[in-house]
């Protein structure tokens, strides 16, 4: 009889943060909105707050970067550690150290689903269907997968059953799709800059931006728009039709997450051949089931916000059963190891975090060491062949641990 590997138990869980409202601006890391000045991601981009003049020029003006990065580390009895990052900052540290720790410490490193279910159940009364608490749970879940992979000596994608393709191809999100094309990406997604409060003039301006990029990128390069919850159904429908002559591939997250009926109406009225996508700010499997029922074409969960890798795998299975695609919101290595195992994820997102989109910078820089970037718009599965998620924590980032237990 062959010996079965004895797995260690989890001895410690620890939580740090960097950046956020209590730190110097521009820390980056898991909260990739926390950038310095003159960065495209904090330019005049349409948001739900754009209707207020005091908050229309910059997303940081209304506090998009106040949370900062949460770092969760889990340590096994044998001294091996796993970690992950997300957007939850100091408040996430409190939740981990003062509440979730009881469900983690003392469990076997393979008890990921048990821990996940207990975290969801224990926070249900104050978590709702997403947000800060779900970000924190996601971060813990990812750290557990990282630890499990390191203990057994396998990359996370092999723990999920292995790759279904040799490489991942990417589109780039940023202000310069023309530069993304030169770098080998299959498409470029731009933020919109105007919203319903700008009326038809706003529609004309964003449509002109798409037209300009279509001329620069040629007829076949994918172009998409990210609307970041800033529109209503009528405005989004008019914008979609205004952009249809320029072969817009999809229009993304036009409405707030809870407006399921609005997404159903938008999908029904969108131009033929143009896809409607959303999901970045949805959390929990149940919310994605409701979103799937609207008939949108692509669901876009963020693995660091939706409940972690455990939930992302469930969302992908749900979408597959309905013939829908899952293309996660860009989350670097945490997405790479998942999507290379999904048959309904033919491409993925890479978020351009360099200020002017002219260079490739790792998304969670500087908090992750050895973080991958695409080469000619692609990442081959062979570069994922390191235990866990294949990255290490940069402990020179002035990590702060405000709580302990």
UniProtKB/Swiss-Prot annotation:
Positions contributing to Mg(2+) binding: 226, 252, 280
UniProt-annotated site: Transition state stabilizer, residues: 349
Keyword Metal-binding recorded: yes
Entry-linked PROSITE patterns: MR_MLE_1
Active-site residues annotated for this sequence: 329 (proton acceptor)
GO terms under biological process: amino acid catabolic process; carbohydrate catabolic process
Site positions for Increases basicity of active site His: 302
PANTHER family from the UniProt entry: ENOLASE SUPERFAMILY, MANDELATE RACEMASE, MITOCHONDRIAL ENOLASE SUPERFAMILY MEMBER 1
Role noted for this protein: Catalyzes the dehydration of L-rhamnonate to 2-keto-3-deoxy-L-rhamnonate (KDR).
NCBIfam families: PRK15440.1
Remaining remarks: Reaction proceeds via a syn dehydration.
Protein's recorded name: L-rhamnonate dehydratase
Highest classification ranks of the organism: Bacteria, Pseudomonadati, Pseudomonadota, Gammaproteobacteria, Enterobacterales
Gene behind the chain: rhmD
